[in-house]
């Protein structure tokens, strides 16, 4: 058995999230069952994070111990898995890593994207958020620029979770226009994220964009460490795990 990082993508619409849940379909369980079926033995996979119900991933990374001795065998397994997995999950590749490499704990950064459209587009339904409000993206970026100055993001954390700390180091947070007129993406990168954190930040930035909150209000919300003062969470269907980065010395 050798350890591999599995690079995959999924449309999260049909799933209760990444993590296995009782009596609800999850991406983790679907992938584990597919691998176990092909290799004819139980195989567990551990993801880089736990995306919520309805959240998508352009790049999720998971580790698993697999009966593959060579990259060619891993490539063959990848091909067989993609034939077995449902259409809303794809495995791009498998990379051999050190025996103790951990997809979650060894990640040095994660990037999420939140997609927004100002124009109704039936082909983006369930993949982007259609906004019916006029948003000031310059003001929203002014507020987002405050985020890397702080570490404690209790104000944007789901309440009553089992995490030991609400500290995160954000290195980038900004809205960018896409090539398609009227479409925007919010990109945020950090060493780690709290449960529901990105959606809470986006929902609060919407209030800045409509003028309901000032830049000072946004700063005060961060400093208050009070979730009740922040905005409601933005819908899950427009959020994507975009990229996970690891130290190069993990790979063989």
UniProtKB/Swiss-Prot annotation:
- UniProt keyword terms in alphabetical order: Isomerase, tRNA processing
Q: Which CDD domains match?
A: PseudoU_synth_EcTruA
Catalytic activity reads:
uridine(38/39/40) in tRNA = pseudouridine(38/39/40) in tRNA
Question: One Pfam family name from the record?
Answer: PseudoU_synth_1
User: Has the keyword Signal been applied to this entry?
Assistant: no
Some GO term, biological process aspect, for this entry: which one?
A: tRNA pseudouridine synthesis
Question: Kind of enzyme, top EC level?
Answer: isomerase
Note whether Isomerase occurs among the keywords.
yes
EC number(s) reported in the record:
5.4.99.12
Family matches, as InterPro entries: PsdUridine_synth_cat_dom_sf (IPR020103), PsdUridine_synth_TruA (IPR001406), PsdUridine_synth_TruA_a/b_dom (IPR020097), PsdUridine_synth_TruA_C (IPR020095), TruA/RsuA/RluB/E/F_N (IPR020094)
Kindly identify the residues recorded as the active site.
52
This protein's source sits in the domain of life called Bacteria
Subunit relationships? Homodimer.
| Stated role | Formation of pseudouridine at positions 38, 39 and 40 in the anticodon stem and loop of transfer RNAs.
What family name appears in the similarity comment? Belongs to the tRNA pseudouridine synthase TruA family.
This chain's protein is named tRNA pseudouridine synthase A
- The gene coding this protein: truA
């Amino acid at each position: 058995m050798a350890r591999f990082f599995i690079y995959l993508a999924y449309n999260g619409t049909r799933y209760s999230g990444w993590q296995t849940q009782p009596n609800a379909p999850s991406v983790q369980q679907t992938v584990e069952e597919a691998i176990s079926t092909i290799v004819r033995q139980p195989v567990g996979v551990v993801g880089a994070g736990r995306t919520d119900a309805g959240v998508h991933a352009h790049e999720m990374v998971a580790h698993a111990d697999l009966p593959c001795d060579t990259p060619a065998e891993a490539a063959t397994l990848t091909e067989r898995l993609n034939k077995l997995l449902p259409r809303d999950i794809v495995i791009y590749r498998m990379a051999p890593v050190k025996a103790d490499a951990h997809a979650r704990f060894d990640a040095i950064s994660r990037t999420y994207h939140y997609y927004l459209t100002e124009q109704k587009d039936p082909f983006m339904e369930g993949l982007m958020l259609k906004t019916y409000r006029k948003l000031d993206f310059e003001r929203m970026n002014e507020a987002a620029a405050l985020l890397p100055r702080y570490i404690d993001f209790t104000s944007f954390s789901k309440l009553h979770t089992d995490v030991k700390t609400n500290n995160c180091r954000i290195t980038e947070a900004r809205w960018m226009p896409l090539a398609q007129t009227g479409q925007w993406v919010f990109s945020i990168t950090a060493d780690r994220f709290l449960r529901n954190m990105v959606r809470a930040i986006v929902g609060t930035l919407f209030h800045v964009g409509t003028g309901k909150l000032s830049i000072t209000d946004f700063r005060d919300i961060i400093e208050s460490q009070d979730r009740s003062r922040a905005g409601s969470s933005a819908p899950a269907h427009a959020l994507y795990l975009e990229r996970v980065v690891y130290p190069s010395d993990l790979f063989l």
